[in-house]
């Protein structure tokens, strides 16, 4: 079957993924040993959907889900982190073009997916989020 970034199936999966991301982001938090920090299961969901349905779906799932979660929890989204969530899922979604998403998933497919996931997280949380915090919110540059 030909892969399509904009099929009806992909759009429905995007809507369901965004809703699932929002609920998990708001209510399912795994405590971490780092103070004031939790592990978010929602990012795994966005990465999975991105790998199966493509980078556009991944970006929209994480972006919309995170924005709605922030809006409902805090009254307004923290846009720099919302964009970073979307970018991390978008980069994970680039694996969509390199892996087999139908049938048996090989060890190579899992390795490729994990490389994209690590790159996506590194770029989003080490570059995009801090830079946008500085640009959008005028946060001080602390090197």
Predicted feature locations:
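Loop-helix junctions at membrane interfaces
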Residues: 1-143
